[in-house]
């Protein structure tokens, strides 16, 4: 018998995804937007692992490794762009940066 039911794992993944989506829609700071995207990616990775463990397949863990590697690449590129924006505009507010387009 498996320790955690599949429904509980998928419910946790859905809650985490909704938290990330709310953070993406509500927050105006680019750093928090990047963190919200990371939460959403980890929630989708958790759903893959839970579904893979339900049917005793390694596919979920393979997809988890793919999602984590994509999240690491996205985080490094996102943080580099964030640093560039902060050096140029001295703010991380989305509204301020979008008003400064020239």
Curated annotation (Swiss-Prot):
Reaction(s) catalysed by this chain's protein: a quinone + NADH + 5 H(+)(in) = a quinol + NAD(+) + 4 H(+)(out)
Q: Which GO terms describe its cellular component?
A: NADH dehydrogenase complex; plasma membrane
Give the keywords, sorted: Cell inner membrane, Cell membrane, Membrane, NAD, Quinone, Translocase, Transmembrane, Transmembrane helix, Transport, Ubiquinone
Under the heading InterPro entries, the entry gives: NADH_UbQ_OxRdtase_chain4L/K, NUOK/Mnh_C1-like
Q: Cellular location of this protein?
A: Cell inner membrane
Give the enzyme's EC designation: 7.1.1.-
Reading the lineage from the top rank, the first entry is: Bacteria
Main localization (coarse): membrane
Q: How does it sit in the membrane?
A: Multi-pass membrane protein
Membrane-spanning parts = 6-26, 30-50, 65-85
Give the top-level enzyme category.
translocase
Role summary: NDH-1 shuttles electrons from NADH, via FMN and iron-sulfur (Fe-S) centers, to quinones in the respiratory chain. The immediate electron acceptor for the enzyme in this species is believed to be ubiquinone. Couples the redox reaction to proton translocation (for every two electrons transferred, four hydrogen ions are translocated across the cytoplasmic membrane), and thus conserves the redox energy in a proton gradient.
- HAMAP family reported in the protein's UniProt record: NDH1_NuoK
Recorded family membership:
Belongs to the complex I subunit 4L family.
Q: Protein name, please? A: NADH-quinone oxidoreductase subunit K
Organism of origin is Aeromonas hydrophila subsp. hydrophila (strain ATCC 7966 / DSM 30187 / BCRC 13018 / CCUG 14551 / JCM 1027 / KCTC 2358 / NCIMB 9240 / NCTC 8049)
